[in-house]
Amino acid sequence: MTKQTIKQTPFFLDAHSVLDATLRDAGYLNDWSFSREEIFAVVGGVAESGVEVVEVGYISDKPDRILAGCCEPDFLGELREHTKGKINLAVMISLTEKNPQTLFASRQGVLDLVRIPCTIEEVDDALRVAAAASEYGIATSLNLVNISTLLPQQFAATAQKVQQSGVVDVFYLADSRGACRPEDISKIVGIVRENWQGLFGFHAHDNTGFATVNALMALEAGCEIIDGTVNGLGLGSGNTKLQYAMQLVQQKEPNKPYRYEPLDRLSRFDVAMPAEKSYFYYLVGAKNLAQLWVEPLVERYGEKTAYYLQQIPRRPYTKIEQVFAEVEADV
Protein backbone atom coordinates (compact mmCIF):
# COMPACT_ATOMS: atom_id res chain seq x y z
CA MET A 1 0.00 0.00 0.00
CA THR A 2 1.34 3.44 -0.88
CA LYS A 3 1.84 6.10 1.73
CA GLN A 4 -1.19 8.33 2.18
CA THR A 5 -1.00 12.10 2.22
CA ILE A 6 -0.95 13.73 5.64
CA LYS A 7 -4.41 15.00 6.54
CA GLN A 8 -4.77 18.75 6.20
CA THR A 9 -5.11 19.89 9.80
CA PRO A 10 -3.81 23.05 11.53
CA PHE A 11 -0.81 21.13 12.87
CA PHE A 12 0.37 20.12 9.44
CA LEU A 13 -0.35 23.46 7.80
CA ASP A 14 1.09 25.94 10.26
CA ALA A 15 4.71 27.01 9.89
CA HIS A 16 5.31 26.69 13.64
CA SER A 17 3.40 24.63 16.20
CA VAL A 18 3.31 23.36 19.78
CA LEU A 19 2.81 19.78 20.92
CA ASP A 20 1.64 19.13 24.48
CA ALA A 21 3.35 16.06 25.97
CA THR A 22 1.97 16.30 29.52
CA LEU A 23 0.20 12.97 29.82
CA ARG A 24 2.92 10.98 28.11
CA ASP A 25 5.99 12.52 29.75
CA ALA A 26 4.51 13.09 33.21
CA GLY A 27 3.30 9.50 33.06
CA TYR A 28 6.84 8.41 33.88
CA LEU A 29 6.23 9.85 37.35
CA ASN A 30 3.08 7.83 38.13
CA ASP A 31 3.22 4.92 35.66
CA TRP A 32 0.48 6.57 33.57
CA SER A 33 -2.12 6.05 36.29
CA PHE A 34 -4.08 9.20 35.44
CA SER A 35 -7.82 9.07 36.01
CA ARG A 36 -10.33 9.58 33.19
CA GLU A 37 -11.21 12.93 34.71
CA GLU A 38 -7.58 14.07 34.72
CA ILE A 39 -7.02 12.97 31.13
CA PHE A 40 -10.18 14.65 29.85
CA ALA A 41 -9.32 17.83 31.77
CA VAL A 42 -5.80 18.02 30.32
CA VAL A 43 -6.78 17.15 26.76
CA GLY A 44 -9.80 19.45 26.86
CA GLY A 45 -7.90 22.37 28.37
CA VAL A 46 -5.01 22.03 25.94
CA ALA A 47 -7.46 21.88 23.03
CA GLU A 48 -9.17 25.07 24.22
CA SER A 49 -5.79 26.81 24.40
CA GLY A 50 -5.34 26.41 20.65
CA VAL A 51 -2.26 24.19 20.91
CA GLU A 52 -2.11 22.08 17.76
CA VAL A 53 -1.31 18.61 19.12
CA VAL A 54 -1.81 16.75 22.39
CA GLU A 55 0.02 13.51 23.16
CA VAL A 56 -2.39 11.31 25.10
CA GLY A 57 0.10 8.64 26.18
CA TYR A 58 1.36 5.32 24.81
CA ILE A 59 -0.43 2.82 22.59
CA SER A 60 0.04 -0.73 23.76
CA ASP A 61 -1.70 -4.10 23.89
CA LYS A 62 -0.03 -5.04 27.16
CA PRO A 63 -2.74 -6.21 29.59
CA ASP A 64 -1.40 -4.27 32.58
CA ARG A 65 -1.82 -0.90 30.84
CA ILE A 66 -4.92 1.28 31.16
CA LEU A 67 -6.12 4.63 29.79
CA ALA A 68 -3.06 6.79 28.97
CA GLY A 69 -0.85 3.72 29.21
CA CYS A 70 -2.52 1.99 26.25
CA CYS A 71 -4.82 4.56 24.55
CA GLU A 72 -7.46 2.10 23.39
CA PRO A 73 -9.37 2.99 20.20
CA ASP A 74 -12.67 3.71 21.93
CA PHE A 75 -10.93 5.95 24.45
CA LEU A 76 -9.24 7.95 21.69
CA GLY A 77 -12.62 8.21 19.99
CA GLU A 78 -14.14 9.64 23.16
CA LEU A 79 -11.35 12.21 23.40
CA ARG A 80 -11.82 13.19 19.75
CA GLU A 81 -15.52 13.73 20.39
CA HIS A 82 -14.74 15.63 23.60
CA THR A 83 -12.44 18.06 21.79
CA LYS A 84 -14.75 18.38 18.76
CA GLY A 85 -11.82 17.98 16.39
CA LYS A 86 -10.08 21.14 17.63
CA ILE A 87 -6.78 19.38 18.23
CA ASN A 88 -4.72 16.57 16.75
CA LEU A 89 -4.39 13.46 18.92
CA ALA A 90 -0.92 11.93 19.15
CA VAL A 91 0.50 8.92 20.96
CA MET A 92 3.88 7.33 21.41
CA ILE A 93 4.71 3.71 20.66
CA SER A 94 7.57 1.73 22.14
CA LEU A 95 9.71 -0.39 19.85
CA THR A 96 9.10 -3.24 22.29
CA GLU A 97 5.51 -3.58 21.05
CA LYS A 98 5.23 -6.86 19.15
CA ASN A 99 2.22 -6.04 16.96
CA PRO A 100 2.41 -2.39 15.90
CA GLN A 101 0.40 -2.98 12.74
CA THR A 102 -2.53 -4.31 14.78
CA LEU A 103 -2.33 -1.30 17.09
CA PHE A 104 -2.44 1.09 14.13
CA ALA A 105 -5.22 -0.74 12.29
CA SER A 106 -7.55 -0.55 15.28
CA ARG A 107 -6.88 3.17 15.75
CA GLN A 108 -7.27 4.27 12.15
CA GLY A 109 -9.53 7.30 12.03
CA VAL A 110 -9.12 8.26 15.70
CA LEU A 111 -5.36 8.84 15.76
CA ASP A 112 -3.55 11.62 13.91
CA LEU A 113 0.12 11.19 14.80
CA VAL A 114 2.29 8.44 16.25
CA ARG A 115 5.68 9.30 17.70
CA ILE A 116 8.36 6.63 17.55
CA PRO A 117 11.31 7.17 19.93
CA CYS A 118 14.55 5.45 19.05
CA THR A 119 18.25 5.52 19.75
CA ILE A 120 20.55 5.87 16.78
CA GLU A 121 21.03 2.09 16.80
CA GLU A 122 17.25 1.60 16.52
CA VAL A 123 16.54 3.90 13.57
CA ASP A 124 15.92 1.05 11.12
CA ASP A 125 13.43 -0.54 13.52
CA ALA A 126 11.68 2.80 13.95
CA LEU A 127 11.42 3.25 10.18
CA ARG A 128 9.71 -0.13 9.88
CA VAL A 129 7.15 0.93 12.49
CA ALA A 130 6.66 4.24 10.69
CA ALA A 131 6.00 2.39 7.45
CA ALA A 132 3.33 0.32 9.18
CA ALA A 133 1.61 3.42 10.58
CA SER A 134 1.68 5.12 7.20
CA GLU A 135 -0.35 2.29 5.69
CA TYR A 136 -3.27 3.41 7.85
CA GLY A 137 -3.03 7.12 7.13
CA ILE A 138 -1.48 7.90 10.52
CA ALA A 139 1.20 10.59 10.39
CA THR A 140 4.57 9.56 11.79
CA SER A 141 7.26 11.21 13.87
CA LEU A 142 10.66 9.62 14.36
CA ASN A 143 12.04 10.91 17.66
CA LEU A 144 15.81 10.51 17.90
CA VAL A 145 16.65 10.29 21.61
CA ASN A 146 19.80 10.81 23.66
CA ILE A 147 21.07 13.43 21.23
CA SER A 148 23.68 14.64 23.74
CA THR A 149 25.63 11.41 23.11
CA LEU A 150 25.93 11.75 19.32
CA LEU A 151 28.51 13.19 16.93
CA PRO A 152 27.81 15.68 14.09
CA GLN A 153 28.30 13.07 11.38
CA GLN A 154 25.79 10.79 13.07
CA PHE A 155 23.10 13.47 12.91
CA ALA A 156 23.78 14.09 9.23
CA ALA A 157 23.73 10.40 8.31
CA THR A 158 20.57 9.71 10.30
CA ALA A 159 18.70 12.67 8.83
CA GLN A 160 19.66 11.54 5.33
CA LYS A 161 18.46 8.00 6.02
CA VAL A 162 15.13 9.23 7.40
CA GLN A 163 14.70 11.59 4.45
CA GLN A 164 15.33 8.80 1.96
CA SER A 165 12.94 6.41 3.71
CA GLY A 166 9.86 8.36 2.65
CA VAL A 167 7.82 7.06 5.60
CA VAL A 168 8.43 9.80 8.19
CA ASP A 169 6.46 13.04 8.34
CA VAL A 170 8.20 14.68 11.30
CA PHE A 171 11.80 14.30 12.42
CA TYR A 172 12.24 15.04 16.13
CA LEU A 173 15.30 15.60 18.27
CA ALA A 174 14.87 14.71 21.94
CA ASP A 175 17.28 16.00 24.56
CA SER A 176 16.29 13.01 26.66
CA ARG A 177 18.97 13.61 29.28
CA GLY A 178 18.47 17.34 29.63
CA ALA A 179 22.20 17.58 29.01
CA CYS A 180 22.35 19.79 25.91
CA ARG A 181 23.45 23.40 26.13
CA PRO A 182 22.03 26.16 23.91
CA GLU A 183 25.07 26.26 21.67
CA ASP A 184 24.78 22.49 21.19
CA ILE A 185 21.19 22.80 20.03
CA SER A 186 22.00 25.45 17.44
CA LYS A 187 24.69 23.26 15.89
CA ILE A 188 22.72 20.01 16.00
CA VAL A 189 19.54 21.50 14.56
CA GLY A 190 21.55 23.21 11.84
CA ILE A 191 23.14 19.93 10.77
CA VAL A 192 19.83 18.07 10.66
CA ARG A 193 18.08 20.91 8.86
CA GLU A 194 20.62 20.66 6.04
CA ASN A 195 19.77 16.99 5.55
CA TRP A 196 16.04 16.82 6.34
CA GLN A 197 13.42 18.71 4.35
CA GLY A 198 10.28 17.76 6.29
CA LEU A 199 8.67 19.03 9.48
CA PHE A 200 11.20 19.27 12.29
CA GLY A 201 10.56 19.15 16.04
CA PHE A 202 12.44 19.46 19.33
CA HIS A 203 11.71 18.01 22.78
CA ALA A 204 13.56 19.55 25.74
CA HIS A 205 14.20 18.46 29.31
CA ASP A 206 15.02 20.91 32.07
CA ASN A 207 17.60 19.03 34.15
CA THR A 208 20.18 21.78 33.85
CA GLY A 209 17.69 24.63 33.47
CA PHE A 210 18.01 25.10 29.70
CA ALA A 211 14.69 23.65 28.48
CA THR A 212 13.09 26.93 27.44
CA VAL A 213 16.29 28.45 26.05
CA ASN A 214 17.01 25.26 24.13
CA ALA A 215 13.50 25.28 22.68
CA LEU A 216 14.06 28.87 21.55
CA MET A 217 17.41 27.97 20.00
CA ALA A 218 15.79 25.05 18.19
CA LEU A 219 13.18 27.34 16.65
CA GLU A 220 15.80 29.88 15.66
CA ALA A 221 17.95 27.19 14.02
CA GLY A 222 15.17 25.67 11.93
CA CYS A 223 12.71 23.59 13.96
CA GLU A 224 9.00 24.17 13.41
CA ILE A 225 7.54 22.27 16.37
CA ILE A 226 8.44 22.39 20.05
CA ASP A 227 7.02 20.43 22.96
CA GLY A 228 5.66 21.74 26.23
CA THR A 229 3.90 20.28 29.26
CA VAL A 230 1.43 21.64 31.79
CA ASN A 231 3.45 23.09 34.67
CA GLY A 232 6.57 21.68 32.98
CA LEU A 233 5.70 18.21 34.28
CA GLY A 234 7.78 15.35 32.92
CA LEU A 235 10.47 12.82 33.62
CA GLY A 236 13.20 14.05 35.93
CA SER A 237 13.28 17.83 36.10
CA GLY A 238 10.48 18.12 33.57
CA ASN A 239 10.09 19.91 30.27
CA THR A 240 9.51 23.34 28.80
CA LYS A 241 6.36 24.75 30.37
CA LEU A 242 3.47 24.73 27.92
CA GLN A 243 2.78 28.45 28.18
CA TYR A 244 6.46 29.19 27.50
CA ALA A 245 6.39 26.99 24.38
CA MET A 246 3.27 28.82 23.20
CA GLN A 247 4.92 32.19 23.74
CA LEU A 248 8.04 31.13 21.85
CA VAL A 249 5.97 30.02 18.86
CA GLN A 250 3.94 33.23 18.97
CA GLN A 251 7.17 35.16 18.62
CA LYS A 252 7.53 33.40 15.26
CA GLU A 253 3.83 33.50 14.42
CA PRO A 254 2.29 36.61 16.06
CA ASN A 255 -1.18 35.80 14.71
CA LYS A 256 -1.38 32.43 16.42
CA PRO A 257 -4.79 32.32 18.18
CA TYR A 258 -3.45 30.79 21.38
CA ARG A 259 -5.52 31.27 24.55
CA TYR A 260 -3.87 31.17 27.95
CA GLU A 261 -7.00 31.22 30.15
CA PRO A 262 -7.62 27.46 29.82
CA LEU A 263 -4.15 26.82 31.23
CA ASP A 264 -5.13 28.64 34.42
CA ARG A 265 -7.66 25.88 35.07
CA LEU A 266 -4.89 23.31 34.68
CA SER A 267 -2.46 25.06 37.01
CA ARG A 268 -3.38 22.74 39.89
CA PHE A 269 -2.65 19.62 37.85
CA ASP A 270 0.37 17.95 39.40
CA VAL A 271 2.22 14.65 39.61
CA ALA A 272 4.41 14.34 42.66
CA MET A 273 8.09 13.45 42.50
CA PRO A 274 10.09 12.76 45.68
CA ALA A 275 11.90 16.00 46.54
CA GLU A 276 15.11 14.20 47.46
CA LYS A 277 15.52 13.04 43.85
CA SER A 278 15.41 16.47 42.24
CA TYR A 279 19.12 17.12 42.78
CA PHE A 280 20.02 13.75 41.26
CA TYR A 281 18.26 14.74 38.04
CA TYR A 282 20.30 17.92 37.86
CA LEU A 283 23.47 15.87 38.27
CA VAL A 284 22.58 13.28 35.63
CA GLY A 285 21.91 16.14 33.21
CA ALA A 286 25.16 17.86 34.09
CA LYS A 287 27.13 14.63 33.63
CA ASN A 288 25.20 13.50 30.50
CA LEU A 289 23.63 10.38 32.02
CA ALA A 290 20.27 8.80 31.19
CA GLN A 291 17.51 9.93 33.53
CA LEU A 292 16.22 6.39 33.97
CA TRP A 293 19.55 5.51 35.57
CA VAL A 294 18.74 7.49 38.71
CA GLU A 295 16.87 4.63 40.41
CA PRO A 296 19.55 1.95 39.86
CA LEU A 297 22.28 4.40 40.85
CA VAL A 298 20.51 5.19 44.13
CA GLU A 299 19.92 1.48 44.75
CA ARG A 300 23.63 0.79 44.25
CA TYR A 301 25.19 3.74 46.06
CA GLY A 302 22.51 4.94 48.47
CA GLU A 303 23.34 8.14 50.35
CA LYS A 304 26.66 8.47 48.52
CA THR A 305 25.02 8.70 45.08
CA ALA A 306 25.15 12.49 44.81
CA TYR A 307 28.76 12.59 45.97
CA TYR A 308 29.86 9.99 43.43
CA LEU A 309 27.99 11.70 40.59
CA GLN A 310 29.72 14.95 41.42
CA GLN A 311 33.12 13.28 41.05
CA ILE A 312 32.73 11.64 37.65
CA PRO A 313 33.52 13.53 34.42
CA ARG A 314 30.87 14.63 31.93
CA ARG A 315 30.89 12.10 29.09
CA PRO A 316 28.42 10.63 26.57
CA TYR A 317 27.84 7.47 28.61
CA THR A 318 25.81 4.92 26.66
CA LYS A 319 25.56 2.18 29.30
CA ILE A 320 25.08 2.43 33.04
CA GLU A 321 27.93 -0.06 33.51
CA GLN A 322 30.26 2.66 32.23
CA VAL A 323 29.10 4.89 35.07
CA PHE A 324 29.58 2.09 37.62
CA ALA A 325 33.13 1.58 36.35
CA GLU A 326 33.89 5.30 36.50
CA VAL A 327 32.60 5.61 40.06
CA GLU A 328 34.22 2.47 41.39
CA ALA A 329 37.58 3.19 39.82
CA ASP A 330 37.96 6.00 42.35
CA VAL A 331 36.41 4.28 45.36
Predicted regions and their residues:
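Catalytic cores and adjacent flexible loops of soluble metabolic enzymes
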Residues: 2-331
